[in-house]
């Protein structure tokens, strides 16, 4: 379907514990993500949430089955091709920000664009500053990570993930190390990116409040979808956004 950005077909993932012992993490899972969706993935520890996210992002390959992203079959790509796809089409945000400590906010956000090599130095710097403006860090351009709070560091990481205009933004517990206020700020940023830029966002989270504020929630148990629920219509998203600024 033209509106499907990510599709998983009959995915199985086994973890090889030894030559004779395998543990099945995901036994047989199929699902699709539509363009512009804001999806949270929840479930108990060991349910396969992060494994599923890494399969979606091409950081791991399934034992069997196929993963499609924006028309590319990730499971058919070699590592060189996957490096290109990850750089160009996927933005990753982790529980820890992984910012380079010796670089400023602008330099950290610039890094994926420098690797991509499709913009001039001026274009890269201009876009890095624009993205920092977008995440409301316009006064932190020259700050290094140790000169920012945890919430600010994570917002720099989000700006970095957006650097190459990814088709999909993937987050693995992005608020896990943050206090409740900073976590709420990150949620509101994701919500704004989704509403205003129609950015497709998929986030693994243990945070129930965060999980239920997305437009769709997928809950895993033992590597299988226990439920897949639409949480909000476009109208309810607009009404909630209005209440936040009223």
From Swiss-Prot:
Q: Name one Pfam family in it.
A: ABC_tran
Question: Which SMART domains does the entry link to?
Answer: AAA
Q: Which GO terms describe its cellular component?
A: plasma membrane
User: Could you say which residues bind ATP here?
Assistant: 43-50
Give the top-rank taxon of the lineage listed in the UniProt record for this protein. Bacteria
In terms of InterPro entries, this protein maps to: AAA+_ATPase, ABC_transporter-like_ATP-bd, ABC_transporter-like_CS, MacB-like_ATP-bd, P-loop_NTPase
- Tell me where it resides: Cell inner membrane
What is the protein's major site of localization? membrane
Please indicate if the UniProt record lists Cell inner membrane as a keyword.
Answer: yes
Q: What is its EC number?
A: 7.6.2.-
Tell me the ranges covered by the ABC transporter domain, including all copies: 6-244
Q: What class of enzyme is it?
A: translocase
Q: Which CDD domains match?
A: ABC_MJ0796_LolCDE_FtsE
Q: How does it sit in the membrane?
A: Peripheral membrane protein
> What keywords tag this UniProt record?
ATP-binding, Cell inner membrane, Cell membrane, Membrane, Nucleotide-binding, Translocase, Transport
Named from the GO MF annotations, one term is: ATP binding
Which segments does the entry list as coiled coil? none
Q: What does this protein do?
A: Part of the ABC transporter complex LolCDE involved in the translocation of mature outer membrane-directed lipoproteins, from the inner membrane to the periplasmic chaperone, LolA. Responsible for the formation of the LolA-lipoprotein complex in an ATP-dependent manner.
Q: How does it assemble?
A: The complex is composed of two ATP-binding proteins (LolD) and two transmembrane proteins (LolC and LolE).
Q: Which family does it belong to?
A: Belongs to the ABC transporter superfamily. Lipoprotein translocase (TC 3.A.1.125) family.
Protein name as it appears in the record: Lipoprotein-releasing system ATP-binding protein LolD 1
Q: Which organism is it from?
A: Chlorobium chlorochromatii (strain CaD3)
């Amino acid at each position: 379907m033209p509106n499907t950005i990510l599709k998983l077909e009959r995915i199985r993932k086994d973890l090889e514990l030894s030559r004779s012992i395998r543990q099945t993490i995901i036994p047989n899972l199929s699902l699709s993500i539509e363009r512009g969706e804001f999806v949270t993935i929840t479930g108990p520890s060991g349910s396969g949430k992060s494994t599923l996210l890494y399969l979606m992002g091409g950081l791991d390959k399934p034992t069997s089955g196929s993963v499609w992203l924006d028309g590319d079959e990730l499971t058919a790509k070699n590592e060189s091709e996957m490096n290109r796809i990850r750089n160009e089409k996927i933005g990753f945000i982790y529980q820890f920000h992984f910012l380079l400590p010796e670089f400023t906010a602008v330099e950290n956000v610039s890094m994926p664009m420098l690797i991509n090599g499709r913009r001039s130095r001026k274009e890269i710097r201009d876009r890095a500053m624009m993205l920092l403006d977008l995440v409301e860090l316009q006064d932190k351009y020259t700050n290094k990570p140790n000169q920012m709070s945890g919430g600010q560091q994570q917002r720099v990481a989000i700006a970095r993930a957006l650097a190459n205009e990814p088709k999909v933004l993937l987050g693995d517990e992005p608020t896990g190390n943050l206090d409740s206020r900073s976590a709420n700020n990150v949620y509101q940023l994701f919500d704004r990116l989704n509403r205003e830029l129609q950015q497709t966002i998929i986030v693994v989270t243990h945070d129930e409040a965060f999980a239920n504020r997305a437009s769709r929630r997928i809950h895993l148990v033992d590597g299988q979808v226990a439920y897949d629920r639409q949480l909000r219509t476009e109208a309810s998203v607009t009404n909630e956004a209005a209440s936040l600024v009223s």
